[in-house]
């Protein structure tokens, strides 16, 4: 989430993978050793490539909340979770939602967990087609 959050402020100077490499270089204290870097790259690239679809779903289910009103932390968490819901079938639906809700309770505003849970739950029920 930190990488996507920071990426939004860089004015398209780098593509997401270049930005990831720069982020790692500038943040040596971050522990990247325990992260599956291939999955991270796939996730970041997938979120960026599918952002329009993902954002359309967020707008569809966040009644009366345009994207511009949603705090950026919550928005990035939902983008990641929605990407996982739609494109990463090996990740259980409940895991994708629970991770986003848990992180929103740590990094988001007070009512973020219920907001994030409501939107992701609606998307999971109405938009996710898994076998």
From Swiss-Prot:
GO molecular function: RNA binding
Protein name: Transcription antitermination protein NusB
Species this protein is from: Caldicellulosiruptor saccharolyticus (strain ATCC 43494 / DSM 8903 / Tp8T 6331)
Superkingdom of the source species: Bacteria
GO biological process: DNA-templated transcription termination; transcription antitermination
Gene of this entry: nusB
Any one GO cellular component localisation term in the record: cytosol
Protein family: Belongs to the NusB family.
Matches recorded under SUPFAM superfamilies: NusB-like (SSF48013)
């Amino acid at each position: 989430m930190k990488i996507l959050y920071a990426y939004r402020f860089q004015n398209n100077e780098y593509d997401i993978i270049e930005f990831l490499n720069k982020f790692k270089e500038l943040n040596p204290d971050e522990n990247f050793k325990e992260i599956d870097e291939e999955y991270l790259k796939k996730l970041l690239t997938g979120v960026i490539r599918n952002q329009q679809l993902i954002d359309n779903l967020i707008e569809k289910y966040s009644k009366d909340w345009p994207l511009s009103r949603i705090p950026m932390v919550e928005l990035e968490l939902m983008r990641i979770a929605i990407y996982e819901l739609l494109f990463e079938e090996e990740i259980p639906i409940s895991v994708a939602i629970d991770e986003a809700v848990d992180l929103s309770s740590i990094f988001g505003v007070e009512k973020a967990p219920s907001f994030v849970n409501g939107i992701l739950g609606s998307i999971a029920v109405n938009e996710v087609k898994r076998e």
